[in-house]
């Protein structure tokens, strides 16, 4: 069957829900018809006799239902159809929430519903007339009203019942009465304003209709003739050596006038309407011969600064400023023209064109006669200037009235960003109860017994994402037996994944970690508010998330001192890196911590561009990344020499010595300064050294492009940079042995593994299994330095817009001071080279290089073995000669089969 003829069928749950919706809607309509067509003579629950035909439209069953509802609830029974239909609709639309029922909220809604129904019934019973032969409030209303009247009288009972209604509404809907009052006030004020503007709008519309046909062909011809006459007169009077400023006024067609009035009266497009009134164009004067022109006298030097060019405005906008706001209500609020006090315009400039300026002197001939009725509001140019809001020039740019300048972000007063920049989390507590945990514990014991494993659950620790069950095994049962059954246990327990913790430090139990049915999100704001982060004195304090029991996990990068992060795509690795960087921004300023960020993907770390913590721009070119790592090696060596001369062991001791000298009023000069290195007559004073954090988002891409030299640079930094205050955070989504090599792992003991695809990847990053059983979305295994047992941590979540807020807050505090040598490289004499590495300029060609080139070009064979046999040299020497030929373009690079093509022609033979 073709795909076009196939019909998508519903699943079992969808069929049930859609069928339930249809049943509820039909039942609601049935009850409504039964109540509407109720007759007291029909058979019912409240009467036993029956004579004649049934008048109810829904038959005897409908008559019975209507009789019961009216008997018990009175007029409140007419609400029942709405309740039935709403229940069916909610169950149909929110079926995915059925499994996440908050029983406490459901109980509150039921209580609110009962308060509403019973309170309304009691009020109807006390104040409304009977309906048919039943009480207006039914039996329920009569019982409640008669029980309360002897104690509270009618007024007190009414107040209490109104209290029931208000409380029931809040409990049922969750809507605050303060919000209701606020919305009612807003609607009332808006309605009052609309009613106040209605007479003016009707008056304006009436005037527009009366004058719409006033413009005739003769008037248009007269207007065009007068405009040309004025233009000729102005040209004759204009001095040749000093061009005067021409102010252009362009006639707007009636369609534009009507469109503007329609749009303005509707209150929309305030800024666009204002631009229609005041639009500047300095390039259309020569292209519009039909436009009206008025030559103004030459301004003096002070007023000539405000050169406006050509001013275009509809000639029908001609009333005064007050008249425009009152009579021609264009929908523009006064805030576009005046400030909050309403006394002066928002925009000010001394060079603004003003009709009251003493430098402007008009002759009688300078005023254009606008006697022709271009439109209903056509008046003279001088009157139009009086009512038009003035424009200004800021830095050579014309700013229209109503176009407010973008607010310049003010520098925050606090030394560090506020936690209020992060969103307030919408916390949803885990609805699992102790009884359910007990049932799961018994189920775990039963499933283990199915595999002949006798174990007892001695502890249950529920967390935001997983729950750990601690098992006490029977004598003689190995923990590895449970580990081998992890997949079978996950299948039998209907769990996504099961992780077995064979060793729990300090306990003799085995841990079994099961994912929760409802997963909670760990928000960064919750973790930043903890005391462990706020009270930490280290400038390199970072937050990771929460552990399996919900406690925040706070670490110190200075004690790690380097971190290796790995995880597959979508496991939460990039979010984890952002959380660590943001927590450092919340803890330290640029005087304490500086960053070098390397982002081969050009997406993850570019958001931090512009923060004052950066030592250079975010590196996206991998050649510049190699230079940045070389600079770090050079800076590390410089700091080591400086600390050695200062007699301190690490950067902490160095900064303490500098701070102590400043407190005592002493100055410590740079002991490494040489007069030949600077133009200054004396050595500069030493200052505090910040810690440097190098963040590499995708380490595998950098190694693929730059090569193995990156591995050597990173290994050298990782070996020695701790005391110098330089720390590495390396992240990769390909945790293979060719990326995370043994040299890197040996020098970076701190690891962080997110979800990986196989056990091999887990062993590569952690040297043990476990990362393949993680749940993703920030679920990680954190291996602290000096330990062999990883801790399971649920990573904190921070959204992109929250990161943008923190970055904008730091950008408002200052600009970064970049060091150009980081990306461009250092001078040749100061180039940092690894052991055994030589600079390109220092490379010497082999003495046999010329002979080898002649041999290769003549024989057209560019293999290492041929050069080795010809000149009887070792393999390494022959390989270096071939590599030099490749660099010089003599031979090509190796192909897929290992062969090289000889590119250079043979040397010419001399006879």
From Swiss-Prot:
Gene3D superfamilies: 3.30.980.40, P-loop containing nucleotide triphosphate hydrolases (3.40.50.300), Winged helix-like DNA-binding domain superfamily/Winged helix DNA-binding domain (1.10.10.10). Residues 182-911 are cytoplasmic. The chain crosses the membrane at residues 16-36, 64-84, 104-124, 131-151, 161-181. Keywords: ATP-binding, Cell cycle, Cell division, Cell inner membrane, Cell membrane, Chromosome partition, DNA-binding, Membrane, Nucleotide-binding, Transmembrane, Transmembrane helix. It is a multi-pass membrane protein. GO terms for cellular component: plasma membrane. Residues 403-427 are annotated as: Disordered. It is found in: Cell inner membrane. PANTHER family: DNA TRANSLOCASE FTSK (PTHR22683:SF41), SPORULATION PROTEIN RELATED (PTHR22683). Belongs to the FtsK/SpoIIIE/SftA family. Essential cell division protein that coordinates cell division and chromosome segregation. The N-terminus is involved in assembly of the cell-division machinery. The C-terminus functions as a DNA motor that moves dsDNA in an ATP-dependent manner towards the dif recombination site, which is located within the replication terminus region. Translocation stops specifically at Xer-dif sites, where FtsK interacts with the Xer recombinase, allowing activation of chromosome unlinking by recombination. FtsK orienting polar sequences (KOPS) guide the direction of DNA translocation. This is DNA translocase FtsK. It comes from Shewanella oneidensis (strain ATCC 700550 / JCM 31522 / CIP 106686 / LMG 19005 / NCIMB 14063 / MR-1). The lineage of its organism: Bacteria, Pseudomonadati, Pseudomonadota, Gammaproteobacteria, Alteromonadales.
């Amino acid at each position: 069957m073709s795909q076009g003829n196939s019909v998508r069928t519903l699943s079992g749950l969808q069929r049930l829900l859609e069928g339930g919706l249809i049943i509820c809607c039909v039942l609601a309509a049935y009850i409504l018809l039964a109540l509407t067509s109720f007759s007291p003579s029909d058979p019912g629950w409240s009467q036993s006799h029956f004579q004649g035909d049934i008048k109810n439209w829904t038959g005897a069953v409908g008559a019975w239902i209507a009789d019961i509802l009216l008997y018990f609830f009175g007029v409140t029974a007419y609400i029942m159809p709405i309740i039935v239909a709403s229940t069916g609709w909610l169950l149909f639309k929110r079926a995915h929430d059925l499994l996440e029922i908050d029983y406490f909220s459901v109980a509150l809604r039921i209580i609110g519903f009962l308060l509403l129904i019973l309170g309304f019934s009691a009020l109807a019973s006390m104040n409304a007339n009977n309906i048919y032969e039943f009480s207006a409030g039914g039996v329920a209303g009569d019982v409640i009203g008669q029980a309360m009247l002897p104690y509270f009288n009618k007024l007190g009972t009414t107040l209490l019942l109104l209290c029931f209604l208000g409380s029931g509404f809040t409990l049922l809907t969750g809507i605050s009465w303060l919000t209701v009052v606020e919305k009612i006030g807003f609607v009332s004020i808006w309605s009052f304003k609309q009613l106040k503007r209605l007479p003016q709008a009707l008056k304006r519309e009436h005037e527009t209709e009366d004058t719409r046909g006033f413009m005739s062909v003769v008037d248009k011809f007269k207007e065009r003739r007068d405009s040309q006459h004025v233009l000729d007169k102005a040209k004759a009077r204009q001095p040749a050596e000093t061009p005067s400023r021409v102010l252009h006024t362009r006639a707007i067609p009636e369609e534009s006038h009507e469109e503007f009035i329609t749009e303005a009266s509707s209150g929309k497009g305030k800024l666009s309407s204002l631009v229609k009134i005041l639009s500047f164009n300095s390039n259309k004067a020569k292209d519009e011969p039909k436009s009206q022109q008025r030559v103004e006298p030459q301004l003096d030097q002070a007023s000539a600064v405000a050169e406006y060019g050509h001013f275009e405005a509809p000639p029908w906008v001609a009333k005064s400023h007050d008249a425009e706001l009152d009579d021609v209500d264009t929908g523009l609020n006064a805030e576009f023209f005046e400030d909050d006090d309403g006394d002066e315009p928002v925009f000010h400039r001394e060079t603004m064109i003003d009709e009251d300026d003493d430098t402007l002197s008009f002759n009688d001939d300078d005023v254009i006669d606008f006697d022709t009725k271009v439109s209903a509001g056509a008046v003279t140019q001088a009157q139009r200037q009086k009512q038009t809001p003035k424009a200004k020039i800021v830095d050579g740019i014309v700013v229209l009235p109503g176009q407010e300048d973008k607010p310049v972000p003010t520098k925050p007063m606090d030394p560090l960003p506020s936690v209020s920049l992060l969103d307030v989390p919408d916390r949803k507590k885990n609805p699992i109860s102790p009884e359910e945990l007990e049932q799961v514990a018994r189920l775990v014991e039963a499933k283990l017994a199915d595999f002949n494993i006798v174990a007892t659950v001695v502890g249950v620790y529920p967390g935001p994402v997983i729950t750990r069950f601690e098992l006490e095994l029977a004598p003689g049962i190995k923990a590895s037996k449970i580990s081998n059954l992890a997949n079978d246990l996950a299948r039998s327990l209907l769990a996504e994944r099961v992780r077995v913790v064979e060793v729990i430090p300090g306990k003799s139990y085995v841990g079994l970690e099961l994912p929760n049915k409802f997963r909670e999100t760990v928000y960064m704001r919750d973790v930043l508010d903890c005391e462990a982060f706020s009270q930490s004195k280290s400038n390199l304090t970072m937050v990771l998330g929460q552990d399996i029991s919900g406690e925040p996990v706070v670490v110190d990068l200075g004690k790690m001192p380097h971190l290796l992060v790995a995880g597959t795509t979508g496991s939460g690795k990039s979010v984890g890196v952002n959380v660590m960087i943001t927590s450092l921004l919340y803890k330290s300023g640029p005087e304490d911590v500086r960053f070098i960020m390397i982002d081969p993907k050009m997406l993850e770390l570019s958001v931090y561009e512009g923060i004052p913590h950066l030592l250079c721009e975010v590196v996206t070119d991998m050649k510049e990344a190699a230079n940045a790592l070389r600079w770090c090696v050079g800076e590390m060596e410089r700091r080591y020499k400086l600390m050695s001369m200062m007699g301190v062991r690490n950067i902490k001791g160095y900064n303490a010595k500098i701070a102590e000298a400043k407190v005592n009023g002493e100055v410590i000069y740079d002991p490494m300064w040489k007069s030949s290195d600077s133009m200054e007559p004396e050595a500069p004073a030493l200052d505090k050294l910040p810690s440097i954090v190098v963040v590499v988002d995708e380490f595998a891409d950098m190694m693929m492009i730059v090569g193995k030299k990156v591995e050597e640079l990173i290994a050298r930094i990782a070996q020695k940079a701790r005391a110098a205050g330089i720390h590495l955070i390396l992240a990769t989504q390909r945790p293979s042995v060719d990326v995370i090599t043994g040299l890197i792992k040996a020098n970076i003991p701190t690891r962080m593994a997110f979800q990986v695809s196989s056990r091999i990847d887990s062993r590569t990053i952690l040297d043990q299994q476990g990362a393949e059983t993680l749940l993703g979305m920030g679920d990680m295994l954190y291996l602290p330095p000096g330990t062999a047992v990883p801790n399971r941590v649920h990573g904190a979540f921070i959204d992109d817009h929250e990161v943008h807020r923190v970055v904008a807050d730091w950008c408002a505090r200052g600009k970064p001071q970049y060091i150009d040598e980081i990306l461009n490289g250092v001078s040749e004499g100061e180039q940092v080279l690894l052991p055994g590495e030589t600079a390109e300029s220092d490379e010497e060609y082999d003495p046999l290089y010329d002979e080898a080139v002649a041999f290769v070009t003549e024989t057209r064979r560019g293999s290492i073995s041929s050069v080795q046999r010809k000149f009887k040299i070792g393999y390494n020497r022959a390989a270096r000669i071939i590599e030099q030929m490749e660099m010089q373009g003599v031979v090509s690079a190796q192909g897929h089969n290992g062969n090289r093509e000889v590119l250079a022609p043979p040397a010419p033979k001399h006879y």
